[in-house]
Amino acid sequence: GSEMCIRDRSSLVQLIPRLYDAESGTVRVGGVDVRDYNLDVLRREVSMVLQKNVLFSGTILDNLRWGDANATEEECIRMAKLACADEFIQCFPDKYNTWIEQGGSNVSGGQKQRLTIARALLRKPKVLILDDSTSAVDTATDAKIRKAFREEIPGTTKIIIAQRISSVQDADRILVLENGQINGLGTHAELLATNAIYQEVYNSQTQGGGDFDKQGGAQ
């Protein structure tokens, strides 16, 4: 149920669901080497939400049920609320029966991201990986999503890759990577006090009144 946030290359977290395997060392989920899991079981327990996920032609409910084909409408609505998607869905005349065009071309980038987060939540994963998946969402909504995660799914491990420090600063642990090496590990307060790279990114994003939304983080 802990959160560990990674601020560097997305390739690291792709080792967890075995999109590819590590050449050396081990990656463990629940203390078990991921290579010892049945691949289907592993990928049911790990959900990954990318910055640019895909929506399909069909209703909003159809798209959400790609996460769980047997999900009830009530379950879909609950997860949409956690992802702050319900608030804009309710503005559509047909609500959850609203038709989504192929690729989600008739919804905004932030709306698309929230729908794909809700879809991932329907899988009820043990590990939820958010790979820059709120980059198109405003900071206030991003904060609401993170608050809902803390309160409603505390038993799910969340691994967050983000462009904004505001998206990761309340995590249990933040991992700073530089050139593929661990440069720092700690809480937001600990890294602000001890880690030069984290301090630099934080200062660059807070200049001019603390508008995290206009400037990106470290790559």
Residue positions per predicted region:
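Short, small-residue-biased leader/transition segments that mark boundaries at the very start
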Residues: G1-I6, S57, I161
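ABC ATPase nucleotide-binding domain helical subdomain, centered on the C-loop/LSGGQ "ABC signature"
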Residues: T26-G31, D36, R43, L61-Q102, ...
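C-terminal portion of ABC ATPase nucleotide-binding domains
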Residues: L82, C91-K95, D132, A140, ...
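Conserved catalytic motifs of ABC-family nucleotide-binding domains
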Residues: N53-A71, I89, V107, L128, ...
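Helix-to-loop junction immediately C-terminal to a conserved catalytic motif
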Residues: I16-P17
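ABC-fold ATPase nucleotide-binding domain signature/coupling loops
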Residues: A22, R28-G30, D86-L115, L130-S133, ...
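ABC nucleotide-binding domain "signature motif"
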Residues: E23-D33, R173-I174, I182
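A short, proline-enriched helix->beta-strand linker immediately N-terminal to the Walker B motif
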Residues: L122-K126, G155
